[in-house]
UniProtKB/Swiss-Prot annotation:
TM spans (from-to): 3-23, 360-380, 430-450, 468-488, 508-528
Membrane topology listed for this record: Multi-pass membrane protein
Organism: Ralstonia pickettii (strain 12J)
Similarity annotation: Belongs to the OXA1/ALB3/YidC family. Type 1 subfamily.
Protein name per the record: Membrane protein insertase YidC
Length: 554
């Protein structure tokens, strides 16, 4: 019966791992076992250039995922040389290129990369391309390939509450003025688009707002992966992600035209989103622009503009960390870009509780320890039931071994005597499994809550752990993880099969190797959980006398 129990556990564990890996791949993540090689650095968008057909056509054409949008640009008129303008606030440093009037580099000043430099989100460099673009279609109008002229004015927030810049271009009978407003303490850039018909005939311009980036993954680990790619939200269809693979295969779908919603680009810990004004009709599109270069966007028809008339519209551009409370306050559904995995309903409340604990303790590492202790206390009755069952099984081990020896050649008789022994001693051989199975969703939810939380970036714990989002630099926590797992196996009943026993002894080593590459915050959670489990199991064993004696064989 012990062998069957162990086999069931192995099958169950393997099934959980394989299901998790399938879920990873179904949601656009890399497989843990057979990762798909990433395509080389994007060939699109070298600095100062754009691919052919880079300006979108109308949404009904562009929405056909995987196809290349038709060019909408005409012959370029004489234009001034472009320049780069840097706007600085307390949270952002934005480099705006007048060639297109777009932010070609956005640094998050309070978010550091692993080298201690400001995190770069938008970028147009040799290594990567990630841009928020806008312009007009429906004619030979100013777009993100047109050179704009920048208005004079302050470029630094200083002691003020906001700083703004207006960039203007005139082309094809349409004058477009883009105004960006950067505010203190905000990752949202308020944007205003003023269109004036300075020609002699009516025009029908459409404003497009798009996020374009290469398909390269960021901050990925060999043993876990997170989603990178476009996402869209509307009041009707709600939130859904679009994988680069689906775009390549022509399987990507976007919502029907509506008057609500936004588009986003998501990566681990960070996101960007174009959010148009409320109750304005919009159409969505997503496609591949060039090799390994993708975009998702919104088109907003501005109606007919008579000669000499003007029309204006607004939008907000968010670019920053996935801080749930902040995202909720910006627009409905934006907090969904934070990926809690398939146990969101459990993970979100757990992270809410973790935030409350952090407000008291002021240290994310100790907050993880405290939350793990609280969860362990909540599940104490279930865990106690499991450990009592395992302790009794360990107590019966000599008698079970004797039964196996007596009935080596008669499995049926052996199983009958085993069942009689279980009934006599009132032991359920699966009693140690079910309580643990019930707890697995909570532990998996906390795993995802920690993995997805940007708050762990750069957050220290003690001594050598300076960043809970990166692996332990000295591998102390993974070693403690292996030791704690080894101690747990010693407290459990010893498998009767020598090969089985060796496998159980090898598992701590295998798991510790995997945890060498996990973020320190996740490993800290598992170490604390294991140590609490050891303390609880040891105390129950001691209470039942299992640590000091074993039932005599009969």
């Amino acid at each position: 019966m012990d062998i069957k129990r162990t086999i069931l556990w192995v099958i169950f564990s393997l099934a959980v791992v394989l299901l998790f890996d399938n879920w990873q791949r179904a949601n656009g993540h890399q497989s843990m076992f057979f990762p798909t090689p990433q395509t080389a650095t994007t060939t699109a968008a070298a600095p100062g250039s754009t691919p052919a057909g880079d300006v979108p056509s109308n949404a009904s054409t562009a929405a056909a995922a995987g196809s290349q949008a038709a060019p909408a640009t005409g012959a370029a008129s004489q234009a001034p040389a472009s320049e780069k303008i840097v706007i600085s606030t307390d949270l952002l440093r934005a480099t705006i290129d007048t060639d297109g009037a777009i932010v070609t580099k956005l640094e998050l000043l309070d978010q550091k990369d692993h080298d201690g430099n400001p995190m770069v989100l938008f970028d147009r460099s040799v290594e990567r391309t990630y841009l928020a673009r806008s312009g007009l279609i429906g004619g030979d109008f100013p777009n993100h390939t047109t050179v704009f002229a920048a208005s004079p004015g302050p470029r630094d927030l200083g002691t003020g509450n906001d700083v703004s810049i207006t960039l203007t271009a005139d082309k094809g009978g349409a004058k477009l003025a883009k105004t960006y407003v950067f505010k203190r303490g905000s990752y949202v850039i308020d944007s205003r688009f003023d269109v004036t018909n300075d020609g002699t005939a009516p025009i029908n311009p459409t404003l497009y707002l798009e996020l374009a980036r290469d398909g390269g993954a960021v901050e990925q680990s060999r043993f876990y992966s997170t989603f990178t790619g476009p996402a869209v939200y509307t009041d009707g269809d709600k939130f859904h992600k679009i994988t680069f693979a689906d775009i390549d295969k022509g399987k990507a779908q976007v919502p029907a035209p509506t008057n609500s919603g936004w588009v986003a680009m998501v990566q681990h810990y960070f996101a960007s989103a174009w959010i148009p004004a409320d109750n304005v009709k919009r159409e969505y599109y997503v496609n591949r622009v060039d090799t390994n270069f993708y975009r998702i966007g919104i088109q907003e028809p501005l109606g007919t503009v008579a000669p000499g008339a003007s029309v204006s519209t607004t939008a907000r551009l968010f670019a920053g960390p996935q801080q749930a409370r902040m995202l909720e306050a910006i627009t409905p559904g934006l907090d969904l870009v934070k990926d809690y995995g398939w146990l969101t309903i459990v993970a979100k409340p757990l992270f809410w509780l973790l935030e409350k604990i952090h407000a008291l303790l002021g240290n994310w590492g100790w907050s993880i320890v405290a939350l793990t202790v609280l969860i362990k206390l909540v599940f104490f009755p279930l865990s106690a039931t499991s450990y009592r069952s395992m302790a009794k099984m360990k107590d019966l081990q000599p008698r079970m071994t004797a039964i196996r020896e007596r009935h080596k050649g008669d499995p049926q008789k052996m199983n009958q005597e085993m069942m009689t022994l279980y009934r006599t001693e009132k032991v359920n051989p699966l009693g140690g499994c079910l309580p643990i199975v019930i707890q697995i969703p909570v532990f998996m939810a906390l795993y995802w809550a920690l993995l997805s939380s940007v708050e762990m970036r750069g957050a220290p714990w003690i001594g050598w752990v300076h960043d809970l989002s990166t692996p332990d630099p000295f591998y102390i926590l993974p070693v403690l993880m292996a030791v704690s797992m080894f101690v747990q196996t010693k407290l459990n009943p010893t498998p009767p099969d020598p090969v089985q026993a060796k496998v159980m002894m090898f598992m701590p080593i295998a798991f510790s190797v995997m945890f060498f590459f996990f973020p320190a915050g996740l490993v800290l959670y598992w170490v604390v959980n294991n140590c609490l489990s050891i303390a609880q199991q040891w105390s129950i064993n001691r209470m039942l006398g299992t640590n000091n004696k074993a039932a005599p064989a009969k």
